[in-house]
Amino acid sequence: MKLILRADVENLGRLGDVVTVKPGFGRNFLLPQGLAMLASDANLKAFELERKKLQAKMDALRTAASDLSAKIAATELVIPVRVGENDKLYGSVTTAIIGDALAEKGVDIDRRRILLDAAIRTLGTHEVRVRLHADVVATLNVKVVAEDKVSDAAEPVVEAEPETPAE
């Protein structure tokens, strides 16, 4: 089945590409989602007229994703977790937990956009990638701390200057 892509599709092609896909993938996913249209002569002509609008829309999405990427890069999440002996985590830190913590910071991102190779199972600072757009991937610093040490991690300790006795 030959289709014209109306948006960038990961592992398939970019906006305007004419691709050949299996009929089930085209009928069940690409066409209903509005990501593609059948590649006929009439649709090719119609797409050329629509291409500039779609390209402007894609550029706006890319710009918004870049702005959000800068905001995410400046954010450091502190996630408190329960730990047992030898600082071993009970459970792990997953994309859902990271997504909820980001939402609390005012950055609303679908948890499926958070890319973790494996769940985080150790204390410390971890770099987590967030795919915001096909071309934009942000890096987020996630600091996993023990629950009883949350106040230490959230607020840096500032030592007071020693007082000199007044004479």
Swiss-Prot record:
Keyword field: Ribonucleoprotein, Ribosomal protein, RNA-binding, rRNA-binding
Gene Ontology cellular component terms for the protein in this record: ribonucleoprotein complex; ribosome
Alphabetized InterPro entries for the sequence: Ribosomal_bL9, Ribosomal_bL9/RNase_H1_N, Ribosomal_bL9_bac/chp, Ribosomal_bL9_C, Ribosomal_bL9_C_sf, Ribosomal_bL9_N, Ribosomal_bL9_N_sf
Taxonomic superkingdom: Bacteria
Keyword Methyltransferase included in the entry's annotation: no
Keyword Membrane: no
Family annotation (SUPFAM superfamilies): L9 N-domain-like, Ribosomal protein L9 C-domain
GO biological processes: translation
Parts forming coiled coils: none
Task of the protein: Binds to the 23S rRNA.
Family indicated by similarity: Belongs to the bacterial ribosomal protein bL9 family.
HAMAP family: Ribosomal_bL9
Name assigned to this protein: Large ribosomal subunit protein bL9
